[in-house]
UniProtKB/Swiss-Prot annotation:
Belongs to the globin family. GO terms for cellular component: haptoglobin-hemoglobin complex; hemoglobin complex. Heme b binds at residue 89. Involved in oxygen transport from gills to the various peripheral tissues. O2 binds at residue 60. Heterotetramer of two alpha chains and two beta chains. PROSITE patterns: GLOBIN. This is Hemoglobin subunit alpha. Red blood cells. The keyword Electron transport does not apply. It comes from Danio rerio. CDD domains: Hb-alpha-like (cd08927).
Amino acid sequence: MSLSDTDKAVVKAIWAKISPKADEIGAEALARMLTVYPQTKTYFSHWADLSPGSGPVKKHGKTIMGAVGEAISKIDDLVGGLAALSELHAFKLRVDPANFKILSHNVIVVIAMLFPADFTPEVHVSVDKFFNNLALALSEKYR
């Protein structure tokens, strides 16, 4: 599903609004994923504390949202822009690519919770399309 110019503009606009809370969004989304989808904990078994609000969860949530921000800056070429990150997850971390969609869903849930007035149905559609394209780009090296 390709992103229209309107989708790209909407994603950039909502990112401008939410980016000051990106670290909080990332930490909450990761904590939700680890709670709701406990099978994802296997990728983080080296962390001593996987509980919501723990240092490792907050730190990785910040990393995740930093990557989302980077993806938005490369929105016209997600596959090329995220090639190194795709390679890392495919060959070194060996993350099942299905987890990209799981995490994306949780990020969307948190954005909707924290920004209910801004997260209109139109924004939801564009953000959902963006995260689907992001997940596909991150899955590129798995093929």
